[in-house]
Design a protein with these regions (language model features):
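Histidine-rich, glycine-flanked metal-binding segment
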Residues: 1-52
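Divalent metal-coordination and catalytic microenvironments
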Residues: 8, 21, 26, 47, ...
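Histidine/acidic residue-rich metal-binding segments in metalloenzymes
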Residues: 133-299
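His/Asp/Glu-enriched, well-ordered alpha-helical/loop segment
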Residues: 196-224, 271, 292-293, 297-299, ...
């Protein structure tokens, strides 16, 4: 069946223009006006933005191994509801995808249950234990890249050797940067809120010192090196300088780090606990500058669901991580676009073209590409209500936030995988 998307304002990477889109066999066949509608199903996008499907570089599906937190089915449906047609799944699973055999377990679960395209990462070290590097040569090309997310690679020479080998394969290293020797039992940012309320803090140096180390290795080796969930202003300056020096370095920003700071923590609640933590207002201002000047390459949610019990133990005792797939667009549109910090075009670029470039995959509403599309209503007012989430995880710092703009339909490879029910 052929499908034509009509009357939408289509994002082409630079601007929103009135175009129609012909879809057949899961691919975009034509883009333009006056397309032949004979025998076509019609999707009327009047009054809506039509963008390439969003791409999330950083998602925890928790499956296999931790299905009490999330499953491939629930996580990918949350992605669809958020407008994401491609998600990259982190490897802190059981089994960890650290060998072809273990990777196949993840691929089989994705094949069975995913409603959007899910690309798994393999780990950098066996079992994410930081002791022995994986067989990169046996895994490259079968995964999105390599990450020990949830942990930083503590040994510098081990990371350097990983980059040397990945550079030869043109494989991506996606790094959670955290020097464990600097954590000192902290669980929120070492800043004003922690001081006022007697909480143990995590210093920003635990992030940026490891980024400084790795950026030097990236420049030396030529490896594609991506920094996960940047939270500190110093990290952004290191990335900025590394790019200027010619390193193949990129970085991502989460919605919560872009919109919140430590002083937004509203009481001793686990929904404000994530890693890295919400940092200072000064760090948030630096993030805005990085979003505007191109230092930051992509938004990524770091969607990290946990059970209600695991998030009910307050700031000190709760598991680290919040959900983000279903709230990303409305909170970013409300908090950045409506306040004049970013244009709608820049926001869309960082949810589509930016992360696609990091991965090295095609992006754009152009003939020959996958028909992965998100339909957006910019005007509707809503309130974040975790009871409506498809995700099994309900912990969000944006609970109760009034938002403007929402995803109304998601099409993945030509198939509607989400349509709003209201």
């Amino acid at each position: 069946m052929k499908t034509i998307v009509k009357n939408g304002r289509v994002f082409d990477g630079e601007a929103l223009t009135r175009q129609d889109i012909l879809i057949e066999d899961g691919l975009i066949q034509a883009v333009g006006l006056g397309l032949d509608e004979t025998g076509c199903q019609i999707i009327d996008a009047q009054g809506q933005i039509v963008s390439p499907g969003f791409v999330d570089l950083h998602v925890h599906l928790r499956d296999p191994g931790f299905a009490h937190k999330e499953t491939v089915e629930t996580g990918s449906m949350a992605a669809a509801a958020g407008g994401f047609t491609t998600i990259c799944a982190m490897p802190n699973l059981n089994p960890v995808p650290d060998s072809p055999e273990h990777l196949q377990v993840s691929l089989d679960r994705i094949q069975e249950g995913a409603s959007v395209r899910a690309l798994p990462y393999c780990s950098i070290t066996e079992g994410e234990k930081g002791e022995k590097l994986v067989d990169f040569e046996a895994l490259a090309g079968k995964c999105a890249g390599f990450s020990d997310d949830g942990k930083g690679v503590q040994q510098g020479e081990m990371m350097r050797q990983a980059m040397i080998r990945c550079a030869k394969l043109d494989a991506l290293i996606c790094a959670h940067c955290e020097d464990e020797s600097l954590l000192d039992g902290g669980y929120i940012h070492q800043g004003e809120y922690a001081s006022l309320h007697g909480h143990k803090g995590i210093c920003s140096a635990s992030e940026y010192e490891q980024v400084r180390r790795d950026a030097a290795y990236a420049l030396e080796t030529g490896c594609r090196y991506h920094v996960c969930h940047v939270s500190a202003k110093e990290t952004l300056e290191i990335v900025r300088q590394a790019k200027a020096a010619g390193a193949r370095v990129s970085c991502e920003i989460t919605p919560h780090h872009a919109l919140l700071c430590d002083m937004d923590i509203a009481g001793d609640e686990g929904r404000f606990k994530m890693n890295p933590p919400l940092r200072s207002a000064e760090d948030r201002a630096a993030i805005w500058r990085a979003l505007q000047d191109g230092t930051a390459d992509a938004f990524a949610t770091d969607h990290a669901p946990h059970s209600a019990e695991e998030k009910s133990r307050g700031l000190a005792g709760s598991a680290m991580g919040i959900v983000g797939l279903e709230t990303a667009f409305p909170v970013l549109y409300t908090g950045l676009v409506k306040k004049g910090i970013l244009s709608i075009e820049r926001l869309l670029w960082m949810l589509t073209y930016g992360p696609s470039r990091v991965l090295g995959i095609p992006c754009g509403v152009v003939p020959g590409n996958r028909a992965d599309l998100v339909f957006i209503d910019e005007n509707t007012i809503d309130v974040v209500d975790s009871r409506r989430f498809y995700s099994m995880g309900k912990s969000t710092p944006f609970e109760g936030m009034e938002t403007q703009g929402r995803v109304v339909r998601t099409v993945c490879q030509g198939k509607t995988v989400y349509r709003e029910e209201r």
